[in-house]
Amino acid sequence: MIIKPKVRGFVCVTAHPTGCAAHIQQQIDHVKSKGPIKQGPKNVLVIGASTGYGLASRVTASFGSGAATLGVFYERPSEEGRPATPGWYNSIAFTRAARAAGYYAENINGDAFSEAIKQQTLAMIARDMGPIDLVVYSLASPRRTHPKTGAVHKSVLKPLGAPYTNKTVDTDKAIVSEVTIDSATEMEATDTVAVMGGEDWEMWIQALADAKLLAPGATAVAYSYIGPVHTWPVYKDGTIGAAKVDLERAAMAINAKLAAHGNGRAFISVNKALVTQASSAIPVVPLYIAILYKVMKAKGTHEGCIEQMQRLFATQLYNGSKLQFDGAGRVRVDDWEMRPEIQDAISAIWPQVTTENLATLTDIAGYQTEFLKLFGFGLPGVNYDAEVEPHITF
């Protein structure tokens, strides 16, 4: 079939297999261009491995350090007349490229929150890999069925305490408008922590430890975002921020467990704001990202997921580097984004932005290009008018 982008709201409902493979190749090429990452991981488990930061971590581990990787994700294969999700195509492309380069790459497609998928993962690690020395936890999910209670928790992106009004942008139509987001109920706040907090990460680490599948000195990392004051009511001080506080609680608990197990470590890496499937869904944030891209590109400090993860691995995690923590014990690769001159420039632009000047004051075009790239569209060297086979498997 011929596959074209179909955007509905903040999601594209089609994905292009050849384009997704080209996007993966771009990421591989970037990591290889930076040279080997020494003293890197050997056996890596990535939970949430099919898109965004999780996928970029997987690419960096294999093509930077030659690591064997097992990716866990929840993606939909193609159906009659309908392409698969981009994460499905991404994971196939990564797996083929990694194996062609001589690296072990396996995948488990299913609900990472479930006990069954954890057991399946442990069995595969025990059979094929041996103890894991890096666990990357990078799940973004709208819901979680609790493995112990069976309760279904749904996450929401809402402020806490009071409704919040600010500017936002419809990234598809390039229209700036004001949006008011109602505040979360207590139940919504609790549910969001249950989905996006640290409990499941702890369960994964406990399961690996119980099965004796954590290497001495193992590292566990989860990803977070803090961002600037413009986004705080809906992000840092909202429901998702409360979940990230719980993730930090979990990091400390896991760190204590791993430290006692051969000097291991666990921490949160605070990453840069980027166009991802997850961030597109958050009101206010896409407008901030469009301005951020404009400012950082002008300064020559713009990074995407793969640049961020390559830098995290090469300058913080491995290569004989020492982790640099902030006052709260977090690693910061949002450091370039949060530089005062970048944030001051954004604060100056923010009040001025309208639909009419959006194209000049922000990088909305760059945002739209990056967004479509997530789904395999707009990649150089891909013929989007050609028939392509949507039904591909591992």
Predicted regions and their residues:
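A glycine-rich helix->loop->beta "capping" turn
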Residues: 106, 120-149
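Canonical Rossmann dinucleotide-binding motif of NAD(H)/NADP(H)-dependent dehydrogenases/reductases
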Residues: 35-74, 78
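The beta1-alpha1 cofactor-binding region of Rossmann-like NAD(H)/NADP(H)-dependent oxidoreductases
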Residues: 109-121
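Glycine-rich phosphate-binding loop and adjoining beta1-alpha1-beta2 segment
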Residues: 66-105, 111
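Catalytic loop of short-chain dehydrogenase/reductase
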Residues: 154-264, 270-293
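Gly/Ser/Thr-rich loops at beta-strand to alpha-helix junctions
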Residues: 48-55, 113-115, 140-144, 226-230
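Rossmann-fold scaffold of SDR-type NAD(P)-dependent oxidoreductases
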Residues: 47, 132-140, 219-224
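NAD(P)H-dependent oxidoreductase Rossmann-fold/reductase module
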Residues: 1-29, 99, 230-394
